Amino acid sequence: MNRVIVNGSFDVLHVGHIKLLEYAATFGPVLVLIDSDRRIKELKGPTRPINRLYERITLLRALKSVDEVEVFDSDIELETLIREYSPDIMVKGSDYIGQSIIGACYCNEIKFYDRIEQYSTTKAIQDISSR
């Protein structure tokens, strides 16, 4: 059975995330590597994350498509976790096609899931803010 890895912040979990994780699970057990709160704040700004780490982990663990969740705080930690897990497959959103992907060299294969344009964390935050 393939070992599958997915990584991201998963802040404001939405249908696009769910579909990506369901797609990943079709290949084997899924380990989700999730950004720490500090890392999200550093990458996305002082108002993020919307959902704290405990909430994001709890939501992900509740999904039948997710087998395990681990936290990382830096690119180095992410790469180390990927190397140690030694996945057969890494699943990324199609927006990563043509980009450098941390830890890709430790995976046998990278699979891309077509992003569902109407679903994004940024869009969800904007929709909530405009109400």
Model-flagged regions — what are they?
Residues 1-131:
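Nucleotidyltransferase catalytic core that binds NTPs
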